[in-house]
């Protein structure tokens, strides 16, 4: 398997340059609540120019910073923000880094076409992850206030967590308000506005969009986006929604209805539960295990998935 991956890397990535990664062009994560983006989970997200997106919504993905990184990759320069991959490769032994796995999901033809484009060209991504805001009704133990309003409320009400034996626990001291710069309901958010403006074009070219949060079903922006998606048939698009499924009957029925109403290739719903009963409820504060299981069965039986 490793030999097959290294052969693929040499033929489709290293043929362009030793630092090339297709994810920097064809994948994007958009943190719309506070206006940040990245194209891989390893480099830290960077800010989106709010003035640029008013003129060109594609600047949500095609930031000046990201274009400079693409230029470096085309020229065989290894960007510092991608150091995780370089460390893996520098070990030797023909190690396979994440740039291979993150590029391999795209066709060789689409990857080869990237080297023919100007380094500063605006790219329509093929895969996208979007978080509209941090609104969430859970406070899971592995999460933090930057991704959950319930986490933030707990810290505001009870103060920051104490007596950590690590120096990297900053997320457990703050209430996460830094990620909610447009208020509780994310009104008049220029990043959301730009994304919705870009959607007619995206809807015809994206292969996959994943909606995460927070808890998407608790976000007004999520339901607004679902209404807009109905207006643009996307026969090649896969929609994936992350949900804790800790939902009341009205909301879970609404989610099921959406799966039937959208004209898309595929609707997938992702939910997680690491344990059973009380143990699960301890890990995911806010979880009612029986409700979660009931909703899961209902989605499996009734949704178009």
Feature locations, PLM:
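Accessory C-terminal segments flanking Radical SAM cores
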Residues: 2-106
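N-terminal pre-triad scaffold of radical SAM enzymes
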Residues: 22-39, 117-146, 207-210
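Short, intrinsically disordered, charge-balanced linker/junction segments flanking boundaries
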Residues: 42, 300-305
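A Trp-anchored, charged/polar loop motif used as the substrate-binding/catalytic surface
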Residues: 63, 67, 109-121, 187-200, ...
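Detector for the c-type heme attachment site
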Residues: 86-90, 143-149
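Recognition helices and adjacent regulatory flanks at domain boundaries
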Residues: 92-126, 136-138, 159
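Core AdoMet radical
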Residues: 125-135, 146-190, 203-220, 232-252, ...
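Generic structural signal for well-ordered alpha-helices
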Residues: 196, 226, 252-259, 293-300
């Amino acid at each position: 398997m490793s030999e097959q991956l290294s052969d693929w890397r040499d033929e489709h990535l290293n043929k362009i340059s030793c630092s090339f990664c297709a994810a920097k062009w064809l994948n994007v994560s958009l943190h719309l609540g506070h206006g940040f983006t990245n194209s891989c989970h390893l480099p830290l997200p960077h800010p989106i120019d709010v003035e640029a997106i008013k003129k060109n919504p594609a600047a949500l993905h095609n930031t000046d910073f990201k274009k400079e990184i693409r230029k470096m990759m085309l020229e065989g320069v290894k960007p510092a923000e991608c150091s995780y991959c370089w460390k893996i490769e520098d070990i030797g032994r023909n190690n396979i880094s994440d740039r291979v796995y993150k590029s391999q999901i795209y066709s060789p033809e689409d990857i080869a076409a990237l080297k023919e484009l100007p380094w500063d060209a605006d790219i329509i991504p093929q895969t996208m992850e979007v978080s509209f805001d941090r609104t969430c009704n859970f406070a899971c133990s592995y999460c933090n206030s930057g991704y959950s309003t319930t986490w933030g409320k707990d810290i505001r009400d009870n103060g920051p967590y104490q007596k950590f034996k690590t120096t990297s626990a900053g997320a457990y001291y703050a209430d996460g308000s830094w990620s909610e710069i447009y208020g509780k309901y994310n009104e008049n958010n220029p990043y959301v506005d730009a994304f919705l403006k870009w959607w007619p074009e995206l809807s015809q070219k994206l292969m996959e969009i994943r909606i995460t949060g927070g808890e998407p079903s608790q976000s007004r922006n999520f339901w607004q986006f679902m209404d807009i998606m109905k207006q643009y048939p996307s026969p090649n698009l896969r929609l994936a929604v992350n949900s804790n499924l800790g939902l009341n009957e009205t909301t879970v029925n609404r989610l099921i209805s959406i799966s039937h109403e959208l004209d898309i290739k595929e609707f997938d719903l992702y939910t997680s539960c690491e344990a059973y009963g009380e143990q699960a409820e301890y890990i995911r504060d806010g979880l009612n295990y029986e409700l979660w299981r009931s909703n899961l069965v209902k989605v499996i039986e009734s949704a178009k998935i």
